[in-house]
Amino acid sequence: MRYISLIIACFSILTMQAQKELVIINTNDTHSTVMPLSSNLDDTLKAGRAGYLRRLALLEEQRKAHPDLMLFDCGDFSQGSPYYTMFKGEVEVKLMNMMKYDAVVLGNHEFDNGMDNLARLIDMSEFAWLSANYDFSATVLKDKVKPYVVLERDDVKIGVFGLTPKLEGLASIENIEGAVYKDPIESAKAVVSELRSESVGCDVVVCLSHLGWNMYKQMDDSTLIANTSGIDLVLGGHTHTYFEELQYVKNAEGKDVPVDQNGKHGIYIGKQRLFIQSKE
């Protein structure tokens, strides 16, 4: 787990004498790795690692130091083990409830057993399910998936929204019937504008993305950031890319936006520390 520090300037939330810290733990593409990976794997970086019990223990330790930490998943916690095959996501969701996730973005594998099953999982979950660039109003997911959620920590408002890749070609047609894909860039612009508006008033905006990293001639996190502004942090997934350190992409205003992604199976997770200070 890496320790990342970001400083985000806000206009009015703090005096010059004070600075507030937000802590985020992020996972992606854990793919139903409920049990640790086999200790017999040739890849010694993976052998015997991961597993939900380890993550639970780590989160317990982190919450002792940071009681108000936020916990996000960037998609594809589904599919990859007999637990998912047999129980169709119920095991994973119940364990994520135990871990006290705040929000997840829909990845493509969340649709592997269709939207009826996904609706069942959402109903048993205790966290928000996000996707700002899909319209599910003609499906059983209507009103169950939100474009964003607003969290508050120490009088700081954090807007968190999700982006899902185009599911055509990634999920069976019958499993996504009625779901309408919307352009991620335009969707992000609209939701960021709403989150930054006076009526919502977010101080920080975080994107949970399952678009992927370095997707050749396809929509990905770099393309998203380059064509938008107002996003402070992108937490990514989908391509199973492991960042040894944060990557930075210039947004439409020329500002560097940090991006994180942590491989797959939950072998690694991310920890972001955001220091919020006033802009004087």
Regions found by a protein language model. Give the residues of each.
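Acidic, metal/ion-coordinating pockets
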Residues: 19-280
